[in-house]
Amino acid sequence: KESRQFGSQRRESEKKAVATALENLAMSAGFSDVNRMTWYLESEKLKELTPLFEGVNLDGVILRLEIDGEGNASLAVEKGGKPLKTLPKALSKNETALRLKETVKELKEQKHRAGESLERAMMESTVFRVDELEKILDNPVLAPQASGLVWTLEHTNGFLQKTDTGLILQDIRGSRHSLKQDAGLRVSHPHDLITAGEWADYMHVLYEEKRKQPFKQVFREY
């Protein structure tokens, strides 16, 4: 029993040490927290994957990374212009094919982590700069999650949209508020929506438009 307790305490201590090291690394790199550093690094990594989205030809079989409108990554396989349901056995040990499969796994994990990070940001009232939100909306894995959430700018709540002229916040009445570069937004908490008398309205919108959220934000018990 004492051995198990010691092992548990040691793991917890190591976990805290890693968290502290990551926080120090983020601060040293000029980020205010670990989440921001992680999102930046993952977005930069996504840029490096651009050729894989265009497709790789392996002995006449085209493999291509795809990300759908909900941020879900998958590996598309086709031969002779026709889609294949599975990867041919001849390519099962091909290094490029294995790398693509591993990349799909990493992108799925990235989506999961992002959902947890955004929920934590809501609970901690983390403020995001407009330039940070622009980068998030440029990331096809993160964008659907951020777009599905309600955001708060001072006393205005709404959904984020990216336009040719910049970010806007569209409120529950359909009014579009342009966001200045120095604006600070946070993920709305149900308390914000209740205070504004808009909680039921956003529930209705999410239900009618079948909007998906990365975590229970609007339909959260409060």
Please report, for each region that a protein language model flagged, where it lies by residue:
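Non-catalytic terminal/accessory regions
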Residues: 1-222
